[in-house]
C-alpha cells in the first residue's frame, strides 16, 4: 500500500511539474507553429513589446522576424526537446532543442537549433521576451536527444 501511495504521489507531482512546464512553453510552441503556418498575426500575439530574437549572430525585433517568414511551398513539422526550465515569479527561463523537418515535393531535410528563451507573465498569459537561437551545421545531429513532435 505504501508503494502505491508513493507512486500516486509521484504521478501527481510529475503531472503538476509537466503542466507548469508546458504552460510556460506554450508561447514558444505557438511562435514556431505560427512560423510554420506563415501566420504573422499569431507571431506578434505571443511576444511582448520588448521582444528580441538573437538569431545566429544577428539581433532581430519581431518586425525583422515577421519580414523573413514568407509563404513557401513546403510543409514544416516541428519537434522539441526541453533541456531544462526555471520559473522565478513572473519570469521563466527555458533551454531546449528545436528540430524542423522541411518537406516539399523534391526533398525532405531536418534542421536543428539549440535555443533558449525568456518568457514573462503578462496578465494571465506567458509571452516571449527574448529568444536566442543557434542553428547547428547541416549534417550535425544532437546526440542523445529525444525529440517530441509538436501537437497541432
Locate predicted features:
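Short, low-complexity N-terminal intrinsically disordered segments enriched in polar/charged residues
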Residues: 8-45, 86-87, 147-152
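A short, structured loop/turn motif at beta-sheet edges
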Residues: 85-92, 119-127
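Short solvent-exposed beta->alpha transition segments
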Residues: 44-81
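Hydrophobic pocket/interface hotspot
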Residues: 31, 42-43, 51, 65, ...
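Surface-exposed, charged secondary-structure patches
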Residues: 67-109
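Positively charged n-region of N-terminal signal peptides that target proteins for export
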Residues: 1-4
Amino acid at each position: 500500500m505504501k508503494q502505491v501511495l508513493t507512486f500516486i504521489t509521484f504521478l501527481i507531482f510529475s503531472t503538476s511539474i509537466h503542466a507548469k512546464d508546458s504552460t510556460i512553453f506554450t508561447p514558444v510552441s505557438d511562435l514556431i507553429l505560427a512560423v510554420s503556418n506563415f501566420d504573422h498575426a499569431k507571431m506578434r500575439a505571443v511576444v511582448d513589446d520588448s521582444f528580441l530574437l538573437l538569431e545566429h549572430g544577428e539581433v532581430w525585433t519581431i518586425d525583422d522576424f515577421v519580414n523573413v517568414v514568407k509563404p513557401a511551398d513546403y510543409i514544416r513539422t516541428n519537434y522539441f526537446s526541453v533541456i531544462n526550465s526555471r520559473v522565478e515569479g513572473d519570469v521563466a527561463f527555458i533551454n531546449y532543442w528545436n528540430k524542423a523537418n522541411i518537406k516539399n515535393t523534391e526533398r525532405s531535410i531536418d534542421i536543428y537549433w539549440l535555443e533558449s528563451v525568456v518568457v514573462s507573465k503578462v496578465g494571465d498569459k506567458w509571452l516571449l521576451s527574448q529568444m536566442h537561437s543557434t542553428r547547428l551545421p547541416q549534417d550535425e545531429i544532437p546526440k542523445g536527444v529525444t525529440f517530441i513532435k509538436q501537437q497541432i
